């Protein structure tokens, strides 16, 4: 299964509550922090919710 590396590039301050909660659910707390997760539909949905706050790249 493919894995995705998600990096937070913008702050969640001043964003809607669901976007802030999604960042926390992804395990992101600081700008520049990255997490690597399995590529699942649930994960993709969370990334789409905060796509303007994160970057995504595939990792092997």
From Swiss-Prot:
CDD domains: Ribosomal_L30. Belongs to the universal ribosomal protein uL30 family. It comes from the Bacteria. Part of the 50S ribosomal subunit. One of its GO terms (molecular function) is structural constituent of ribosome. One of its GO terms (cellular component) is cytosolic large ribosomal subunit. The gene is rpmD. One of its GO terms (biological process) is translation. Keywords: Ribonucleoprotein, Ribosomal protein. This is Large ribosomal subunit protein uL30. The keyword Ribonucleoprotein applies. It holds the Pfam family Ribosomal_L30.
């Amino acid at each position: 299964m493919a894995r995705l590396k998600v990096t937070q590039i913008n702050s969640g301050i001043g964003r809607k509550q669901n976007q802030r909660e999604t960042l926390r659910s992804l395990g992101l707390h600081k700008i520049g922090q990255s997490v690597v997760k399995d590529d699942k539909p649930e994960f993709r949905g969370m990334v789409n919710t905060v796509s303007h706050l994160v970057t995504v790249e595939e990792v092997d």
